[in-house]
Amino acid sequence: MAAKKSQKVTPLMQQYNSIKLKYPDAMLLFRVGDFYETFGEDAVKAARILNIVLTNRNNGGERTELAGFPHHSLNTYLPKLVKAGQRVAICDQLEDPKMTKTIVKRGVTELVTPGVAMNDDILNSKSNNFLCAVHFGKKNLGVSFLDVSTGEFLCAQGNTEYIDKLLQNFGPSEILVQKKFKKEFNESFGKDKHCFYLDDWIFKIDYSEETLNAHFQTKSLKGFGIDHLEEGIIASGAVLYYLAETRHHRLQHINSINRIAEEQYVWMDRFTIRNLELYHSTAANAVTLLDVIDKTISPMGGRLLKRWLALPLKDAEMIEKRLQVVDFLIKNPEILANIQDQIREISDLERLISKVATQKISPREVNQLKNSLNAIIPVKELALKCNNEALKIIGDNLHSCDLLREKISESISEDAPVLIQRGGVIASGFSSELDELRGLAFSGKDYLDKMIQRETEKTGISSLKIGSNNVYGYYIEVRNTHKDKVPEEWTRKQTLVNAERYITEELKEYESKILGAEEKILHLEQELFGKLIAWMAEYIDPVQQNARLIARLDCLCSFAQQAQAENYSKPEITDSYGMDIEEGRHPVIEKQLPPGEVYVTNNLHLDREEQQIIMITGPNMSGKSAILRQTALIVLMAQMGSFVPARSAEIGLVDKIFTRVGASDNISMGESTFMVEMNETASILNNISDRSLVLLDEIGRGTSTYDGISIAWAISEYLHEHPAKPKTLFATHYHELNEMCETFERIKNFNVSVKELKDNVLFLRKLVPGGSEHSFGIHVAKMAGMPQMVLHRANKILAKLEASHSMEDSGAVLKKSAEDEMQLSFFNLDDPLLEDLKQELLGIDIDTLTPVEALMKLNEIKRMLGNNKQQ
């Protein structure tokens, strides 16, 4: 909103208001002298976000809020504004105030938004900063991702579920949406995204094709392999439109657009990505898989590893190539160490060369680019000497950029500053004109020393001094005791208490030369630096290629280092439908164990013929969920091309990983824990394939016991009878499901073993054949610190209930019900009170019960028994 107006608005505020009207959705940083000022509502927001002083100023009779900061602090305050979700329009002075007698011309030079930023203080070095656009088509949705700081440009299209998965994977900082689809977007993807809404006309195929072809200087998009993706093209066009609107016109580094090939990568929906905690966790300070396996050194390597984690491969040949490189590096630790030593010398090549394209690179960063390219030479030589085909290909394709490195070396000083205004950017010997000017400007001390010596000899004044100030410039200072010796041609300029200051024609001449030289030096350095940057733009493609190859090599070195350190093994990827893991471990839990504690490994076998579904029972806290997660993580790591935490692993290619793990709710969308659970499970059942891996944990826990058992049974039966026969791990504490193995031949029972001691339970965390009959919920309650009285009473009630129920086995009822079309019919008790108690206890979910709730429940049971005695 523009600042408050009145009939007597000052010319400065008139100018501010006219510019603000063009950017109503952005905070306007308005350059006034040495400060960036904000006014009105912008000032209120800025003061709150930046914790700076909010004041008022008189604006033609009105009071206007004002908050500002020094212009040189822009890089300190701008990131804070953008990270707070603000779109920031930077309005600069477009002319020198000294050169105009009227108000200084001003204009917006850049619009910085959460998704469009080049500032290093805004960006995370190991994460992409994606701007995204989503287009709602008639049949499909289109999506596009662009990181303006690296030049990566991607697009895809598909159903809502696929786009949702991509949004989860790529985590865009800002999403562009058509205004009329705001409601649909919120319903499909939630309200927690940072969105900006654009006019409908932007989302048209003709406009988008024209925009993309104009940008890439092509006549067709066939060469990029996206010509058939109409919705994806429309989304991509919207992204380029937004860049133009935000004053980002220098985009030479965005020289390609790639399709996200859905068929090349393992499918993981957003629930799976969340449940496996690949790179985010809902728990505070939780360790993710990325935290454990990321041993990358370079920023671009870190970003690529995150992409590999989000998009594991389905192509066995591509996986094997990665594994072979990792295997070679492990067997040749000296080569691994040498390559990593050189990668440490390489800065963020992708973002540095992007700054060349956008002309935002500093002199010091140009040297960083040169040093990074220098470090690539030994990497290239090492890779070419390796007895590994994939590494040789990397070596072949690394560009030495000889001319670029040479040009930077001869033109830029080794100790070049960050800001060109500080001078000393261009190396000596590069420009004879510059060297001559520097000789004049910086040989001043010698010249002045000679002048003092000469004038002292001529006048006989031994205490002569030459100095300068902003008012009088250069002067000769003579003490009062010697002023009678001053020559007549000297002109007195200033009288002090003990001295007089004079100027001479020679000194005036020298001063004009010095001042002119310094100004010319700055101008010439800026001109030469600008020409160098324009020339360097010719190397955008080869430097980007180097960045991609170094990132790839960095990831493979990271895999090798991790495998060495943690004793991982090379997985065998096959075309079979089975899975055989020997002594598998959970990579994250293993790293968090106390010193000296050994991780309990587990074997696991799945196939389509005999052991398609493993039903895992066992007490709470025994490690059922860990076994499920570690299986998924081992498969995922293997198909990334990494070694895995197991003694051995033979894995038939998996094309989809589904997980339903842990309880959560979605209150903001009006969904209960059970509704969320059913939504996620329905998504799994509707998308399974013959190469799917399905992991289900405690399905049905969010509803009543009978409902839960019925649903869990029916889901297991559905998966068993489905033609795809997906490999499934099903963890449950419904012991009734153990009976399924007698009816369904490919369901096998396993349990996570425990050892019962006199008054305690020891969790062995070992997966063994056979079902478990006990949940040991009361033992878990004891571990949680439940009062002894509650535990004692719970044991008594449990014993009575078990004795009462021994007359008829609930598992047998379930087995019979499966044969009788799932008509559940549980035992009847003659005593109505016992029936009431049974219903009360069966309705208790011990996993979610708090100590206070347990006490209240026991008090209710006691009241029921007391009432019965009185009757």
Swiss-Prot record:
**GO:BP terms for this protein?**
mismatch repair
Give me the residues that bind ATP, please: G618, P619, N620, M621, S622, G623, K624, S625
Q: Which UniProt keywords are given for this protein, alphabetically ordered? A: ATP-binding, DNA damage, DNA repair, DNA-binding, Nucleotide-binding
Question: HAMAP family, per this entry?
Answer: MutS
The job of this chain, per UniProt, is described as: This protein is involved in the repair of mismatches in DNA. It is possible that it carries out the mismatch recognition step. This protein has a weak ATPase activity.
Q: Which family does it belong to?
A: Belongs to the DNA mismatch repair MutS family.
> What protein is this chain from?
DNA mismatch repair protein MutS
Record the organism. Answer: Christiangramia forsetii (strain DSM 17595 / CGMCC 1.15422 / KT0803) (Gramella forsetii)
